[in-house]
Amino acid sequence: MKDKRIYGMFGPKIRAMRLEQGLKQRQLAELLGTDKPMYSKMELGARRVRRDQVPKLAELYKVDEKELMTLWLADGVYAALREEDESLRLDAIDLAKEYFMAQN
């Protein structure tokens, strides 16, 4: 059976932080303006947290917003490349890195 997780890093991270603070999924769903089933899918990696929700999560969990945003962005890269051949994934990442470096 194929793994249903599209976003593999961010969901488990926010789940771990929620459990560490003893919060319920319902509470987080409310904070983010969504429902519990959708929030559950976010934690499972089946749905992506919206960019504007990341700062809210960082504030709630009292974690560095840049660190959480970096993880969120990396998750997007993972989702875009996850089904590609390994060498193609790595080449694409290297090329993107070169492009970003040339822009600075």
Language-model features: locations:
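Residue-level signal for the short linker/turn that defines the boundary of a DNA-recognition helix
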Residues: 12, 22-23, 49-52
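Residues within the helices of the helix-turn-helix
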Residues: 15, 26, 55
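Short alpha-helical DNA-recognition segment
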Residues: 22-41, 60
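A short, Lys/Arg-rich alpha-helix, primarily the initiator
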Residues: 1-20
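Short, charged recognition helix plus adjacent turn
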Residues: 69-104
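Residue-level detection of the helix-turn-helix DNA-binding "recognition helix"
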Residues: 19, 33, 44-46, 55, ...
